[in-house]
Amino acid sequence: MVLLLAAACGIEPSGPDGATAGRLVSQPRAVTATPESPGLHEVDVGSSRPALLYVPSTYRPDAPSPVMVLLHGAGGDARGGIDPLLAFADEAGVILIAPSSRRTTWDVIGGRFGPDVMGIDRALEHVFARFSVDETRLGIGGFSDGASYALSVGLTNGDLFTHVVAFSPGFSAEGEAVGRPRIFISHGVDDRVLPIDRTSRRLQPRLRDAGYDVVYEEFADGHVVPADKARRALDWFLR
């Protein structure tokens, strides 16, 4: 496992196969199931905590839509994951899918990839079976631990994800990096939960040195996702 700022978090190498390697199986394909109507829906992904799916009012089956997977922070749930971009989804025409971690936070935070990868896979499979997807705008993002997990899964699956959005991440702990997704990182200079000097200010130059196209923005606040940064990230994703 390639580690960027992960040593201090106790990340260990994962197994070579399936979810333990952080690899996703789902791929965009022909629609085979009836899509949900516009609005917010719970989706069963095989765990005790459902995912949340938001279908924008502007969705048209004959026009492929951008899709963004959104991951919550520690102690959160699917609603916390989807909320930062929810207000902008209709105008942007983006489908949002937000799974929940199996435990209080995402598995790689505890040392290795595991069942949470399968939860993301099942959430994506649900979307791919029901909606026409724009494969040039397929993103994964998150806040705090969710941002770290989005970076970790996104870089491990850069042949699937075109964009990764990380709001106040702590680290990236990808498996074997595949592809070169574009990356957006924002972080508050007054963050006391994941101090910026120990996280994003170290992480973003290392990602650039590894060859990634990184947009990096700091803002005058703490461990939050300001609405203007959420909108900025979505505009970047859609251009």
What are the roles of these predicted feature ranges?
Residues 184-186, 192-239:
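C-terminal catalytic histidine-bearing segment of alpha/beta-hydrolase fold enzymes
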Residues 34-58, 62-132:
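Serine-hydrolase catalytic machinery in alpha/beta-hydrolase-like enzymes
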Residues 9-67, 112, 145, 153, ...:
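A domain-start/cap signature at the N-terminus of enzymes
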